[in-house]
Regions:
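C-terminal, flexible cofactor-proximal segment of oxidoreductases
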Residues: 2-15, 345, 350-443
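FAD-binding core/adjacent interface of flavoenzyme oxidoreductases
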Residues: 2-25, 92-187, 270, 281
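Beta1-alpha1 glycine-rich phosphate/pyrophosphate-binding loop at the start
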Residues: 2-96, 100-101, 184, 191-235, ...
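FAD-site-proximal beta/loop scaffold in flavoenzymes
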Residues: 5-13, 144-174, 266-269, 273-344, ...
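A Rossmann-like FAD-binding core segment of flavoenzymes
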Residues: 6-8, 89-109, 201-309, 313-315, ...
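Short, well-ordered coil/turn residues at beta-beta hairpins
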Residues: 112, 129-130, 258, 283-284, ...
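Short glycine-rich anion-binding loops that position phosphate/pyrophosphate groups of nucleotides
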Residues: 131-134, 197, 286-288
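Rossmann-like dinucleotide-binding core of oxidoreductases
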Residues: 178-235, 242, 253-255, 337-365, ...
Length: 443
């Protein structure tokens, strides 16, 4: 039955895929990100049929998306086909589809597959691990001019905008327009914004330095805006100050306590001041995907489902929400929306379901173990905070690089990323500086 799910034909589009008496229980996992993959792997020995659904055929190592956006890495180097990741786990099937509805009463979901219409899929257990999307805080119209960075398409769009801006700067004789093309504004000074700004600064000062005759990319203006009072607000203030100083040395203008009021094709208005810019990038926050709201349960302001200490949806037996789709509290504080938390939640739920399938009752609620926070600020400099330990500098950067290489999904990803990093480190060059025809400058 699982194989049939992955090969739906148009004439089967209205069928209800139900579990028949005597068959194994079906666990449906929506989302092939960190939490979804972890949940599936935790069920590898379970006597269950596991169906992993994602609208994309690949898993993304999101912590390095900013390096695709700044041409350090190519998309394939931080991504892996979900089917390949699950190939050795015989109780897992993969379905390329987008979930468009959830019916808890009938315990079915609606899944729309490319070229195969919509079909209903029955479940015994449901794990929602659908991740997040950019949060424009009530101003979704900003998205047209300020793309976020949450998937490979976003990363390639941003890369094309950055590289295309320099091509357009070459073509104009207007001094003001050239300055606008060479001004980059990043909204949001969390880890994503800091890492993207630092990598972009290094790109314009080193990689592109001798590539143009009529312009000097090193004269570009890079502005990092945030409505809060400091960068990296989840880190200790001392580390935030160090990062701000390092960003300034790289040539990044850090403006905190500034709220963005308008984003349009000419730039942004922030703190009452117009900043002309052809490239505005949004790294200010995240919101949950639409799927948690389909459950009909309570959600927080970001659309994340409120769950109990066992990551279950209240009054919905066998339904769990994990990762960025869940609002998880611990000791009165929200569990951070980071990869390590998503992995721990997915693993916990997978193991919980496996025990329940054996007739065992799980008494221990989910507990998040904080392994520490890290952020890299370009070449040779990173910051680390773990409990009382707070470090920064070159050795911390080496630790960051080592941890991220080991965390990549496949051996080939680790080898390719390591190779690209070594090449970039010693030459200053970035080999993924491609502008696809679909993203040509001015289009």
């Amino acid at each position: 039955m699982s194989a049939m799910l992955a090969e739906t034909r148009p004439d089967e589009a209205t069928a209800v895929v139900e579990a028949h008496p005597g068959e194994r229980k079906r666990v449906v996992i929506i989302g092939g990100g960190f939490a979804g993959i972890a949940a599936a792997h935790a069920l590898r020995h379970a006597d269950a049929e596991v169906l992993l659904i994602d609208r994309r055929n690949h898993h993304i190592f999101q912590p390095l998306l900013y390096q695709v956006a700044t041409a350090v890495l190519s998309p394939a180097e931080i991504a892996a086909p979900i089917r390949q990741l699950e190939a050795k786990q015989r109780n897992v099937s993969v379905l390329l589809a987008e979930v468009t509805g959830v019916d808890l009463a009938s315990r079915t979901i609606d899944a729309a597959s490319p070229g195969a219409g919509v079909r209903k899929i029955a479940f015994d257990y449901l794990v929602v691990a659908t991740g997040m999307r950019p949060n424009y805080f009530g101003h979704d119209e900003f998205a047209r001019h300020a793309p976020g960075l949450k998937n490979l398409n976003d990363a390639e769009t941003i890369r094309a905008k950055i590289l295309g801006a320099f091509e357009l700067a070459v073509m104009t004789e207007d001094v003001d327009e050239r300055a606008r093309q060479m001004t980059f504004v990043l909204v949001g000074a969390g880890p994503s914004g800091v890492e993207l700004a630092a990598s972009l600064a290094q790109m314009v000062k080193v990689t592109l330095r001798n590539n143009f005759r009529r312009i000097d990319p090193s004269k570009s203006t890079i502005i990092l805006l945030d409505a809060g009072n400091r960068v990296l607000p989840t880190f200790a203030e001392a580390l935030s100050r160090r990062v701000t100083r390092h960003l300034t040395k790289l040539g990044v203008k850090v403006l905190t306590g500034v709220k963005v009021e308008t984003v349009d094709e000419q730039g942004v208005v922030a703190g009452g001041q117009r900043i002309p810019s052809a490239t505005v990038l949004w790294t200010a926050g995240v919101a949950a995907s639409p799927v948690p709201k389909m459950l009909g349960s309570k959600t927080d302001r970001a659309g994340r489902a409120l769950v109990d200490p066992f990551l279950k949806v209240v009054d919905a037996p066998g339904v769990f929400v994990v990762g960025d789709a869940a609002s998880v509290m611990q000791n009165g504080h929200p569990v951070p929306g980071v990869a390590q938390a998503a992995i721990q939640q997915g693993r916990y739920v997978g193991r919980l379901i496996a025990k329940e399938l054996k007739g065992l009752k799980v008494k221990r609620p989910f507990r998040y173990f904080d392994k520490g926070n890290m952020a890299v600020v370009a070449k040779n400099y990173a910051v680390l905070e773990r409990g009382w330990l707070r470090t920064s500098g070159f050795l911390t950067w080496l630790v960051w690089a080592f941890v991220h290489i080991l965390s990549l999904p496949q051996l080939q990803n680790r080898l390719r990323v390591q190779h690209q990093w070594l090449w970039s480190y010693f030459t200053g060059q970035r080999s993924s500086r491609l502008i696809p025809e679909t993203h040509e400058p001015g289009h």
